[in-house]
Amino acid sequence: MARRPARCYRYCKNKPYPKSRYNRAVPDSKIRIFDLGRKRAGVDEFPLCIHLVSNEYEQITSEALEAARICANKYLVKIGGKDSFHLRVRAHPFHVVRINKMLSCAGADRLQTGMRHAFGKPNGLVARVNIGQILMSVRTKDSSRATAIEALRRCQYKFPGQQRIIVSKKWGFSQYARDEYIEKRSRGEIIPDGCYAKFLNKRGSLQEKLDLFPEASFNLA
């Protein structure tokens, strides 16, 4: 039987139905890789962050997420090179959709029960997204801003509904605004931690803070 069109599963009508010990024999998700590009680049290397945000409350199939991932990755690698960006898919397909297979051949009424026992069997996985939820994010250098925006624009053709592209005010994937990050980094109150950053808080052992943040100035008065 051919794959049912994704428009049949676009709207969030029922409760979330994840894979569990009661819901077995679920097909594998089509998307298996969620981070691409230079994943190990430090937080200081890619200050610019751009998001693709959903404008609708809907379901997106794992096939659509995989198609968008391939589309964005190909364009970014072609224009900027494989080490010029870090792409992350932030919508994960956990909701299981079902199908009640119906026969259309002659004598089908003798072989099946129609809409009796019509619960259906697992057919695929979709991601349930809300309005304002981030679907994909790219962190890169300021010089690659136009390339990243164009890559995410092309991804919009792989998704149903409407999306918008937002240039984040944060520094990369961190939680700090760009001005705040530069200021605290110069004072030694922030240290890189992969693609994120650790910040100096006012709790905990003073000796641990001195070991972690040797460049920070501590007011012990």
UniProtKB/Swiss-Prot annotation:
* Record-linked Pfam families: Ribosomal_L16
Keyword Secreted: yes or no? no
Gene Ontology process terms (BP): cytoplasmic translation; translation
Record's Gene3D superfamilies?
A: Ribosomal protein L10e/L16
- UniProt similarity note: Belongs to the universal ribosomal protein uL16 family.
What functional role does this protein have? Component of the ribosome, a large ribonucleoprotein complex responsible for the synthesis of proteins in the cell. The small ribosomal subunit (SSU) binds messenger RNAs (mRNAs) and translates the encoded message by selecting cognate aminoacyl-transfer RNA (tRNA) molecules. The large subunit (LSU) contains the ribosomal catalytic site termed the peptidyl transferase center (PTC), which catalyzes the formation of peptide bonds, thereby polymerizing the amino acids delivered by tRNAs into a polypeptide chain.
- Give additional notes from the record: There are 2 genes for uL16 in S.pombe.
Q: What is this protein called?
A: Large ribosomal subunit protein uL16A
